[in-house]
């Protein structure tokens, strides 16, 4: 069983930042376990700009922002495993994981950092009624389909909710040639930033 000082579960921005910080602080062996096929996490599908202003003092897209962390991690020779799913963490900090190359394996860690990121609520948790789910997507799923998979989920779009991701997807779908019929909001005000309301809705007459 291989041993590491720190095992970080999740290779998104939080996991990468934790690994870089640990390595710069003098920790000898750091390992990142990422279930996706590349590092970067949710940032890989966020191709709009607005990232990096505080950390790098410049405006970057999500993939550019992730790339800065990935470059630093590689410069520091931080180990990582992709397409790897963590199955269990024991009280003794033994991490059980699996991937196609190694099968099921165990890693002994002195410390474990959980940096798995967040997930959207499911269709059921969102209380979307009906029994025909075809054509109904969460904003994050639609974003991944368009920006990463290259799949257009629809040509006539109604967006429920005016949070930032909904506003950004209204603009993105418009860029791809879809007709965004309406962005519907239950509250009397938008949940998104004023900047996104102007740049994503007003500028495109949505």
Regions found by a protein language model. Give the residues of each.
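Residues forming the flavin
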Residues: 1-206
């Amino acid at each position: 069983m291989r041993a590491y000082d720190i095992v970080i579960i999740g290779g998104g921005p939080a996991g990468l930042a934790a690994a870089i910080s640990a390595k710069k602080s003098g920790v000898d062996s750091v390992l990142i376990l990422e279930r996706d096929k590349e590092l970067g996490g949710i940032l890989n599908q966020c191709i709009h700009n607005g990232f990096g202003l505080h950390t790098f003092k410049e405006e970057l897209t999500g993939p550019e922002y992730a790339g800065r962390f990935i470059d630093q991690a590689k410069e520091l020779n931080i180990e990582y495993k992709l397409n790897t799913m963590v199955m269990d963490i024991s009280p003794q900090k033994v991490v059980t994981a699996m991937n196609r190359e190694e099968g099921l394996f165990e890693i002994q860690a002195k410390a474990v950092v959980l940096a798995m990121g967040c997930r959207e609520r499911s269709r059921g948790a969102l209380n979307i009624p009906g029994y025909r789910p075809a054509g109904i997507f969460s904003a994050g799923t639609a974003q991944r389909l368009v920006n990463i998979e290259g799949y257009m989920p629809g040509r006539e779009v109604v967006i429920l909710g005016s949070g930032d991701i909904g506003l950004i997807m209204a603009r993105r779908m418009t860029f791809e040639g879809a007709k965004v019929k309406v962005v519907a909001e239950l509250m009397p005000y938008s949940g998104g930033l004023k900047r996104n309301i102007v740049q994503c809705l007003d500028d495109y007459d949505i």
